[in-house]
Amino acid sequence: MRAFCTVSAPLEVCASSAEQLSPGSRFLALRLLGQQQPKTLYFLVDAKSRVREVYTQTCLHFATQGMLDTELFGLAVLIDGEYMFADPESKLSKYGPKSWRSSHTHGLDANGRPLLELHFRVQFYIESPFMLKDETSRHNYYLQLRHNILQRDLPREQAEQALVFLAGLALQADLGDAPPGTSNSKDDSGEETSASPSNGGRGLSATTTLPKISKRANERMLRLSTYVASTSKRETIPLPPSLPPNGADYYRIEDYLPSGLHTPWARSAMRACHREHLGMATAEAELLYIQQACSLHETINAHTYRMRLAKSEQGSGSAWFVVYAKGIKILGGESTNSSSNPETTTFLWPNITKLSFERKKFEIRSGESRITLYAASDEKNKLLLTLCKDTHQWSMKLAARLKEVSKREEEEAAESQRLHASYACSRSLLLPYKSKNEQRISVISSTSSNTTSGIVSDRVHSEDELEIMINTPPAPLAAPSTESLALAHLLDRPSVSRQTSSVGQMSLKDLEEQLAALSVRPQDASSNGATIVTNSSVQRNSMGTTANDSSTATDSPSSQHNIGSQCSSTCSTVVVTSPVNGAGASSSGAPIPVHSTSSSLELGFSHTAQNSALSETSPDDFLSTSAREETESVSGASGVYTLAHGAPPTETSGVYTMHSSELTGQSSEIAESEKSSHYGMFQPQKLEETHVQHSDSVDGKKKEDFRPRSDSNVSTGSSFRGDGSDPTDNKHSLLSAEELTNLIVGRGTYPSRKTVSSSLHSDCDYVTLPLGDQGEEEVDQPPAPPPPYSARHEKTGLCGPPIAKPIPKPIAVVAPKPDSPPCSPPVPPAPIPAPPPAIRRRDPPPYSISSKPRPTSLISVSSSAHPAPSAAGSMSSLKSEEVTARFITTRPQISILKAHTSLIPDGAKPSYAAPHHCSSVASSNGSVCSHQLSQQSLHNSNYAGGSQASLHHHHVPSHHRHSGSAAIGIVPYGLHKSTASLHHQQSCVLLPVIKPRQFLAPPPPSLPRQPPPPPPPNHPHLASHLYEREMARKQLELYQQQLYSDVDYVIYPIQDPAVSQQEYLDAKQGSLLAAMAQAAPPPPHHPYLAMQVSPAIYRSTPYLPLTLSTHSRYASTQNLSDTYVQLPGPGYSPLYSPSMASLCSSYEPPPPPPLHPAALAAAAAAGAGSSSSSMFARSRSDDNILNSLDLLPKGKRLPPPPPPPYVNRRLKKPPMPAPSEKPPPIPSKPIPSRMSPIPPRKPPTLNPHHANSPLTKTSSGAQWAGERPRPDLGLGLGLNRGNNSILAQLQASMVAQSHAQAQAQALDIALLREKSKHLDLPLISALCNDRSLLKQTKVVINPKTGQEMPTSSAQPSGATTNGVANSSAGAGTLSKARKGSTVSHRHPQDKLPPLPVQQLAEANNYVIDPAVMMKQQQQQQQHNKTS
C-alpha cells in the first residue's frame, strides 16, 4: 500500500504552468456520463499511480455532490470501441500509451489534451431503479442507460415505439415541459396527417384522430396508445405541411434516438410523447425512464462485449457476451435484426459452476455443459473474468437492499390497489413507487438442472398485452385460460404489446376500464399487431430467455407495470418442448400453441438478487448456492474464478468456480421467497395417491407436481394456483378459464386484510379454535404400553407419552395472549375431519393417513438479528433422486411460538407454547431460539403429542447441511424402515450445541441402554393428568394442530389458570416418579441394535479436546427425563436414553464422577470405603444437573504432561534401558526417617471404586488419545488430570496423612518408568512423594547446597534416563526433607523446578522461579537448624 495518495483532486482544466509540476507528474482525463457535452474531470497523477487512487478521488468528488452509490460506478478504458473496466490495483501507465509514460509534456498531446483517458461508467447494473439511494446516482444511471440505448443494436420492430416513448421521457427529464410554441394548429385540434406506403410502394394517406389532451393520466396514455399503434409500421411518412423544418426542433434527435429512427414520424411522435409528460418532475421522469429502459431489451441494462464463437473467426466476433445483474447471456451468431434473431443462452449465477480463461479462450461451465468463446486479446479475457466475478459478488452484497425495496413496493402496491382505477393509474405514473401489480410469469426450467439457466424466460402478462389480443387472432389469447397460459409461458419476453404497441401500452397498466376503452382501437392495427406478437414471441422463444429474466423492471419488484392486479403471480413452467420455428410462425400470423409439461402459478412478488436455485445435482444442499464469498483476484491473461484456495492465477490463465460458499447463511436470510424469486425453482413434491389425478397440461406432467405456493403477504386467502385449482379444495378442482382470467387481470376478489378461518386446513392467516367439545379424532390402533414417564422438554421438544394412570390433581397451563389479535372476528368453527393432514404449509395438498412416509423437516436457526422464520423442508419426495425442497419464506417475524418470542436461556422456565415435537434445536451460541422454530417443525413424534392423529408412519430423513452456523438438522425420533413395528427400539436424541461442520460419527456404545417405550394406546390420555376436562384436552389438541398448520398466527387455547407453573413442574416430576414405580423394566436392548435402528445420532460434543476446553452446557435445563450423562472415555456411549439413564431402577448405574475439590478432602478423610453416593455434589440451579460431574479443574491450569512415549519424540533422548534390564535393587524396608510424609498424589484410598472403575485410573489424555486403559498394578498413581487441580490434590494429601500405606508400597523405579509412559503424570511427582525411589536413581543430594552430585563419573547409559532428569530436577524440593521428619511441601501455585541443561531440558517445560528456589533453600536451612 502506498504511503500517500499520488493523485490530485479533480481539476476543471489541465493548463497549469510547467514550472509548478514535478517531472513525474502527468495529466489524466476522466470522461463523465452525458450525451450533449459530457463533462471532463482532470487529475494530476504520478507515473506510478494506480487506478484505485483515481477512483477514490472520483468518489470523493461525487460524494460532495450527494452521491451515495459510488460503488455502483467504475473507471473504464476504451479498448477497440468497448468499455473495459480497469483493474483497481493496476498502474495507470498500463492503460496509457507509451508516449504518456515517457512524455516530457506531463502527458499532454500537441493540443493540450491528456493522452490517457478514463471513463466514468456504471459497473454494476441493478434490478430495480428504486434501489438507487440519491438523485445524483439516479441521474448518472439514467445517463448510462441513454448511452446504452443509442449504442445497442436493438430489433427494430420491438424497439421503435419503445424508443420513441423513452425519448419523450428523456426530453421531459432534460428539458422539462415541452415549449408551447412547437405544436401547430392541427396538433392542437387533435389531428395529425400521415401517409404510409402500401404494397406497391404507393403512398396512401391515412388520418388518425388524436383525442384532446387531458390531465388524467389514463386518458393520456390511451391517446398515445391509439396514436402510436395506428402508425406503428409506417416506414416512410412524408413531412406534414405544417411541420417545421428540422432545424427548428428544440432538441437534437441524435441525442435521444438511434440513427435508424431519425425519421419525421419519430420526430413528431417524440414531441407528442414529450407533451404527454407535462408537469412531470425531472426525478420522476428519470426514474420512469430507467424502469422502462430496463424492460426493453436484455442488452440495455447490462454490459455487452463482442466475442468470437470460433478460434478461426476474424474480426471482433459475431457473439455478444452480456453481463447483467443475475448472470451472463450469450447472444450468438447472427446479427440482431428483425429477420434473424440470435440464439440466446442464459447462465444465472447459481447455475454457473466455473468461469475460466486460458489466454484468448474464455469458458463458461454450467453443470455438464460448457460454452467456449474467444476474445481478441488476453487482456480482454482477464478483464471480463474480473467483471463477472465482481458483478456476482456485488449482486450478493446488494441482496439486502433489494429485499427492502421489494417490501416497500409491495406495501405501496397494496395501498394503490384499493384506489379508484383512474386514480391508481395516475398515481402509478406520477409517483415513483406506486408500481407493483403486474402478473409476472417466470418460465422456470427444472429439467435443465445446471446446464442452462434456472429461469428460461420471464414475461409480463398484463392487460397491455391483452389490448392487442382483444382485436387480434388467435382467439384463445384474448382470455388467459389454462391452455393459453401454457402458450403464454413460452413467450420469452414481455413480447406482445409492450414491445409492439406504443407509449401507452408500455406504461399503462391493467385496469378494467381501459380494456373497454381499448376495444375501440382502429382495426388497421390489428393485423400488424398480430404479426408482431407472433414474430417477437417466437423469436424470443428460440432465444430461450429474455431481457426481463427477472432483472428488468417489468417483472422485478420495482416494476412500473405492476399496478392492476392483487398480487404478482409467478408461474413456474418446465419447458421441454422444442421451440417453434420463427419463420413459420411469422408467415402464418398466429402462434402455434405449445403446451408446457409442468407449471404452477404461484403467488407473491418477493424478488431478491440472491435467491436460491434448487439444483438436482446437489441434493444435500439445504441452502442456496448462490451466495458466495470469493477471495481470489484474477491477474494476467487467464484466471479461474474459484472459492477454493488453489494455485494463484498467472498471466495466462484464471478460474472462478462458484460451487460452495461461506455466505449461504446470509443468502437464506436475505432471500424472502425462492418461489417468487428470480433464480428460484422447486423440485416437484410427491402427493398422496388418494388425490384426484390431474391431467391438465398447465399444472404438470404428473399429479405429484403440485408445489407449495409462495408465501405472499398480499394474497393470503382465496388465492388460486396456476392450474386454476382452489387452494382450499383438497381435491384440486380446477377453476374455469373465465374465473382464472378474472383472477389474473385483477377482477377477482382478493381480501386486502388478514383472513381468519375456523378450519385448521385453510391457508388463512388466523385460525379460531372452538371452546366447546368436538368429536374425538380417529386414532390408529393402540400400540404397546406407555413408557414410565410423561414429560416433554420445553426446549428440545423431546416428549414422552403419558403415564397409564392420571394424577388426581388437574393441572392446566396458563395460556399467554397472542401478540397480535386477528383482524376480523372469528368465524364459527367447523368440526375437524377425522383424519387430518399431517402437515400443512401455505398451500400444499393434504397428506392422508396412509403408509406413506411423513415428511421430515429441517429447522433453520438463523444467526441474524431479524431473520425470517424458516419454512424449511416441506414434503420430502419418495424417490431417492429427488431433492428435498428448500423454502425461504417472506412471512413476517411471526412464528408458531408467538406467545413466547424471546430467546430462552438455559435456565429459563418451560415454554408452554412450544410444540410437542420430538426435535431439538440449538443455536451456535448455546441458546435455543425457540421463537425461530419453523411452522413445520417436525411432525415426527412417534409418541404422538397432544393431537397427532396418525402414529404409524415411516420417516424419510432429508439431507441437510450447515449454513454458516445457522442451521442444524433435526433428527427424528425413529429412522428405521419399519418404525411402526419397532416402537420399542425408538431412541430419544438430544442435539447439542455444535459449531458448524462438526457433525462427527458417534462412537459405538459399549453399554446396553434402555430404549424409550412405545407410544401410548390413546391420544386423550396424553394430558389426562394435566387437563381433566374434555374441553381443555380438546383445546390442547386443536392448538397443537395449529402448530403443524401453515397459519401466521395461532390463537392459544384458554386453559384454567388456577394452577401455577411451579405446580405444573411438581406434577410433572411426580408423574415421572409414579410412572417409575408402576412400570415394569423393559426388556434388555442391545446397544449395537439401537445404533442400527437410529443411525442418525450425533455426539453431544466433538471428540477430542472440546469437552476438556469448555464446560458442557447442553441445550436443556435440569429436567431429569430430558438430559443424559456424558462420561469421558471410549467405554461408554455418549448418548444415554434421557429417562432410562437417570430414572430406571433396572439400569446399571454409571461410573462415579470425580470429586469436587471441596469434597475431596472429606472423602479422603472418610477412608477408602466411602460410598459413591457421598461423591455427588449438587449442581447450580441454572446448570445441568449432571454438571456435578465436574470434568474440568476449577483452579489453576495444570502444568503440561510429559511427552507420551519418549522414544517417539523428535528430540534426541538418552537411550532407555531395555525391558529385560534388571532394575536397581530396592531396599527391603524403607527408612521411616527418610520417607516423605506426603502420600502419593492420588492414593488408592481416594478412589472408592477402585475395583470396578478402571477409567478413573487412566489419564484423560490417554483416554482421548485412544489408548487402552491399563491397570494401575497397585501404584496408586493414576491421576485424572482433567478432574482435580493440584491444589485439591495437595489438600487431600495433607488431610490423609497415611504413612503406613506409603511405607507398605515400595515402588520399583524400572516399573515406574515403564508405567510413566502411559500415565498422564510426571515422574517428578512420584519422586517427590517416595524417597525410596531416590536411591535407585543413584543421585546424591548435598544437604548444604541442595544440589545433586552423581556418585560416579562413569555412569552407565541406562542410568541417565528421564528418571534421572526428573529426579535431579526435583532435588531442590527433595533436599528440604533431608533430616526433618516433616517437610514443607511445595506451594500449589509454584512451578516445578527446571531440568538440567545437559539432559535436554527443551523436551519439557517445567521451570521454577529463582525467588522460590531461594525461599526453599532458606526454609531448608531453618529446618536444619531446628532439627
From Swiss-Prot:
Cited Pfam families: FERM_C, FERM_M
Recorded consequence of changing Y227A: Inhibits wing growth. Reduces phosphorylation by Ack
Biased segments, Basic residues type: 951-963, 1376-1388
Modified residues (Phosphotyrosine): Y227, Y423, Y679, Y766, Y1103
Keywords: Cell membrane, Developmental protein, Membrane, Phosphoprotein, SH3-binding, Transcription, Transcription regulation
PROSITE patterns, per database record: FERM_3
Positions of the UniProt region annotated as Disordered: 176-212, 520-566, 611-656, 688-732, 766-792, 815-880, 939-963, 1000-1022, 1190-1267, 1345-1398
Intracellular or extracellular location(s): Apical cell membrane
Substitution effect: Y423A: Inhibits wing growth. Reduces phosphorylation by Ack
Biased amino acid composition, Low complexity: 545-559, 860-877
CDD domains: FERM_B-lobe, FERM_C_FRMD1_FRMD6, FERM_F1_PTPN13_like
Motif SH3-binding per record, residues: 1008-1020, 1149-1157
Alphabetized GO MF terms: DNA-binding transcription factor binding; kinase binding; protein sequestering activity; SH3 domain binding
The keyword Transferase is assigned to this record: no
Chain span(s) of sequence motif RXPPXY motif: 842-847
Alphabetical GO biological process terms: border follicle cell migration; compound eye morphogenesis; compound eye photoreceptor cell differentiation; endocytic recycling; energy homeostasis; follicle cell of egg chamber development; negative regulation of cell population proliferation; negative regulation of imaginal disc growth
Subunit structure: Forms a complex with Kibra and Mer. Interacts (via RXPPXY motif) with Kibra (via domain WW 1). Interacts with Mer and Hpo (via SARAH domain). Interacts with Schip1; the interaction results in recruitment of Schip1 to the apical cell membrane. Interacts with ack and yki.
Protein name per Swiss-Prot or TrEMBL: Protein expanded
Organism: Drosophila melanogaster
